[in-house]
């Protein structure tokens, strides 16, 4: 949802939009909670409070004050990610299709012949990183840019089997216009750009697990971050390959040679980072015009020195000349050398051309070896061709996508490779590598061993759920890693499936109860965004591919009402109750009935079950930004840091009742996942709370009334306001609590309206208006380690007779309290108080 704050109402009506007027009687937290549970996507928030907007944004719900109708029209028609700390809106708006254009934030693409293959009459527009070049389009009171591009489709095309680019793009654009927007993918880059700088300010060692190509620019500014990926393809790995011949397959209709060169250099940069944790000088021989240098330098400040007879316009220093092996001595330490020399074929016949290529390959390799032979902190990526070669077994083979699969591949070398054993690799084996292997990632670091790193902050986004990881080891890591942000795939199934398919692999599934974390927040993507100064206009949906975000060691753990809080907890319930259910009171009715409380009069006002826990359990798929376990735990140790709002602390028994209702709901829905989750949350409540039950009571609290509007034959009809199991020396403690609660007890608005048979031979009158005070005094007794209340639900009633009688219904009648007392069962009254 998105909250668009206005000082005045607007005349126009918008679809899926609701108006909320700030309620001055309620504080900012209550207003934020009420707004978050509205069911439409767009909320027009009138007479807004800045504090309420701040609360919503910290909760991950995009909320922004608008100053003009133009701002409203722009934001209401699309989704966006909001940097509420820097006041920047990143739109995810594809309406530019109506201008017959596709967009890119990679400059090199604009220098290709891609426009020849676009839809008729369409053009390509460069918009800069995250749409930075579009800022001038929006003259708003806040910074605004459109981060939507088609780079994801272009890159998907490059790695796909498709060759017809126009048909591919047409299909993908139609899909984009008919399916739900993958909002997390669009905002993930914004998130990563906020996440890693903030982590590096606080942590010396940051480890990142499982980066992919979409992060290839993100980490250029962070050479000290240690990356873990799927490892490199080494020369020694070719032993598994059978020999093949030249294939000559075209990959792309437009020229992507620059993309290949960029990926090669980025691979070398990140390989260098892994070895030396600093930025290198980048030397390049050949590969002009290298327009992609603009992209790399746009993200991060690198020094490029290049040699080529052709121009290289974005190089820091360009030598318009050839480079020879004797020039190697000009190159400094702490550098990368990229060798991409290849003479144009011209009119040469195939045999002569092949001989030239092989000679150049050997020459390239000689330059690489000479460069690495002396000095320190060096990495070289060199262009090779399929031919009989002796190569170091530890050298890395690269084959990033290029326009055509021919005989070209690249070799990544470091100084250690020079001293390693060399192996003869036949030409046919190298063709087999070229024909069958595509390097899919610029990150080729070693795989992560799933174990605790005590001196590091671990970031593992979408990296550890795969079933090639041991599930128990992943859980152990999350439980024991003191500082981390790790995601795992949430169990969205109804049959409690332990793993589910994803693309061509399987993922383990998890619930929050699978983890025994200490001082960790378990939330959703949008809940996590709020912790890092971001919010989003589209909440997580139960797509089947959702993830829990688990943050260990955050200083926001105790700020229970600010981050990963209860906002939106009733939203799904409201959507169902007010559209599909038998009555809008259905949730209240079900919760009472499932706990054998049949007095439904005023059930929406006085409910015997925690709606928070119940909704968090049965609708966890729709809102898991609320960290339920943290909420329970902090209450159990009485360390809840509440900034504001009308706050009601639940008694532990209310939480147990909610779990019982949720379990019955799950059984009726045949939802095995909610059934297990509810059982495990109930077990967790019993673990963190030391709940004892007065199932064999020896004292009770009684309330006697001045007026009983029914006939009765007991001596003194009274309400048993809870039973206790205590030693006699604890009686003074109970009396002290009753005295403290005196005003609240006598202020109870107690009513009755009918009689019924509680069981055979027990005729009683119903009592309403006491449950909230009962749970409050339950909490006080619990915190003083006094056993109060039974394991079965407290059903307030007044015993009228021990004979079977007919039910009587009367107008709701207020009962006046005469006295409240503490009496020993089958004994005397030990304390009595009157108003």
From Swiss-Prot:
The lineage of its organism: Viruses, Riboviria, Orthornavirae, Duplornaviricota, Resentoviricetes. It is found in: Virion. Contains a bipartite N7-methyltransferase domain, a 2'-O-methyltransferase domain and a GTase/RTPase domain. The C-terminus contains a phosphodiesterase domain that degrades the 5'-triphosphorylated, 2'-5' linked adenylate oligomers produced by the host cell in response to IFN stimulation. Residues 693-835 are annotated as: 2'-5'-phosphodiesterase activity. This is Protein VP3. The keyword Transferase applies. Interacts with VP1. Interacts with VP2. Keywords: GTP-binding, Host-virus interaction, Hydrolase, Inhibition of host innate immune response by virus, Methyltransferase, mRNA capping, mRNA processing, Multifunctional enzyme, Nucleotide-binding, Nucleotidyltransferase, RNA-binding, S-adenosyl-L-methionine, Transferase, Viral immunoevasion, Virion.
């Amino acid at each position: 949802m998105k909250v668009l704050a206005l000082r005045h109402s607007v005349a126009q009506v918008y679809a899926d939009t609701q108006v909320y007027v700030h309620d001055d009687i309620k504080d900012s937290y209550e207003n934020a909670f009420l707004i978050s549970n509205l069911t439409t996507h767009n909320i027009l928030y009138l007479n807004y409070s800045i504090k309420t907007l701040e609360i919503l944004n910290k909760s991950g719900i995009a909320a922004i004050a608008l100053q003009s109708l133009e701002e409203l029209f722009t934001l209401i028609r699309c989704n966006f990610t909001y940097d509420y700390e820097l006041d920047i809106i990143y739109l995810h708006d594809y309406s530019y299709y109506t201008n017959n254009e596709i967009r890119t934030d990679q400059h090199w693409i604009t220098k290709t012949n891609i426009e020849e293959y676009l839809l008729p009459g369409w053009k390509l527009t460069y918009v800069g990183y995250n749409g930075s070049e579009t800022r001038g389009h929006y003259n708003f009171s806040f910074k605004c840019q459109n981060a939507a591009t088609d780079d994801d489709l272009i890159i998907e095309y490059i790695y796909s089997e498709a060759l017809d680019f126009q048909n591919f793009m047409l299909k993908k654009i139609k899909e984009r216009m008919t399916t739900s927007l993958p909002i997390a993918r669009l905002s993930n880059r914004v998130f990563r750009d906020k996440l890693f700088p903030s982590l590096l300010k606080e942590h010396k060692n940051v480890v990142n697990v499982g980066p992919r190509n979409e992060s290839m620019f993100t980490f250029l500014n962070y050479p000290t971050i240690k990356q873990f990926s799927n490892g490199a393809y080494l020369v020694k790995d070719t032993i598994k390959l059978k020999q093949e011949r030249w294939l000559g397959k075209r990959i792309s209709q437009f020229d992507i040679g620059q993309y290949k060169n960029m990926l090669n250099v980025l691979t070398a940069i990140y390989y260098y980072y892994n070895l030396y944790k600093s930025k290198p000088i980048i030397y390049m021989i050949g590969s002009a015009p290298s327009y992609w240098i603009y992209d790399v330098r746009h993200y991060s400040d690198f020094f490029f020195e290049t040699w080529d007879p052709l121009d290289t316009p974005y190089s820091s220093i360009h030598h318009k000349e050839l480079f020879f092996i004797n020039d190697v001595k000009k190159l400094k330490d702490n550098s990368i050398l990229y060798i991409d020399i290849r003479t144009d074929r011209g009119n040469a016949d195939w045999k002569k051309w092949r001989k030239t290529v092989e000679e150049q390959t050997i020459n390239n390799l000689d330059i690489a070896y000479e460069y690495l032979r002396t000095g320190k902190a060096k990495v070289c990526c060199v262009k090779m061709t399929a031919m009989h070669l002796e190569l170091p077994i530890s050298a890395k083979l690269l084959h990033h996508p290029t326009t055509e699969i021919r005989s070209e591949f690249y070799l990544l070398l470091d100084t250690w490779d020079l001293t390693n054993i060399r192996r003869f690799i036949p030409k046919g084996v190298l063709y087999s590598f070229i024909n069958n292997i595509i390097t899919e990632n610029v990150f080729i670091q070693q795989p992560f061993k799933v174990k605790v790193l005590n001196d590091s902050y671990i970031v593992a986004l979408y990296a550890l759920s795969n079933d090639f990881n041991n599930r128990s080891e992943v859980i152990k890591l999350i439980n024991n890693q003191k500082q981390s942000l790790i995601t795992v795939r949430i169990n969205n199934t109804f049959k409690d499936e332990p793993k589910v398919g994803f693309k061509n692999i399987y993922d383990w599934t998890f619930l929050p109860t699978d983890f025994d974390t200490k001082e960790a927040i378990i939330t959703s993507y949008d809940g996590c965004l709020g912790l890092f100064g971001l919010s989003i206009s589209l909440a997580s949906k139960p797509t089947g591919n959702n993830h829990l975000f688990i943050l260990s060691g955050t200083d926001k753990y105790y700020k229970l009402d600010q981050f990963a809080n209860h906002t939106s907890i009733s939203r799904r319930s409201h959507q169902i109750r007010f559209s599909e259910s038998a009555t809008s009171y259905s949730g209240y009715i079900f919760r009472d009935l499932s706990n054998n409380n049949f007095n439904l009069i005023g059930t929406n006002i006085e409910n015997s079950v925690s709606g928070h826990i119940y909704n968090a359990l049965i609708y966890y798929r729709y809102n898991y930004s609320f960290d339920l376990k943290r909420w329970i735990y902090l209450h159990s140790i009485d360390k809840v840091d509440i900034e504001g709002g009308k706050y009601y602390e639940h008694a532990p028994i209310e939480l147990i009742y909610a779990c019982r209702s949720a379990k019955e709901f799950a059984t009726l829905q045949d939802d095995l996942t909610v059934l297990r989750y509810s059982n495990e949350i109930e077990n967790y409540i019993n673990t963190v709370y030391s709940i004892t039950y007065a199932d064999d009571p020896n004292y009770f609290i009684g309330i006697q009334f001045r007026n009983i509007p029914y006939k009765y034959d007991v001596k003194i009809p009274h309400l048993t306001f809870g039973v206790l199991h205590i030693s006699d020396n604890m009686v003074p403690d109970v009396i002290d609590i009753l005295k403290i609660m005196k005003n609240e007890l006598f202020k109870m608005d107690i009513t009755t309206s009918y009689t019924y048979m509680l069981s055979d031979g027990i005729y009683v009158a119903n009592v309403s208006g006491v449950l909230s005070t009962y749970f409050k005094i339950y909490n006080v007794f619990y915190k003083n380690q006094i056993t109060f209340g039974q394991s079965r639900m407290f059903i307030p009633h007044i015993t009228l007779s021990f004979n079977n009688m007919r039910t009587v219904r009367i107008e709701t009648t207020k009962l006046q309290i005469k006295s409240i007392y503490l009496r020993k069962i089958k004994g005397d009254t030990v304390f009595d108080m009157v108003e």
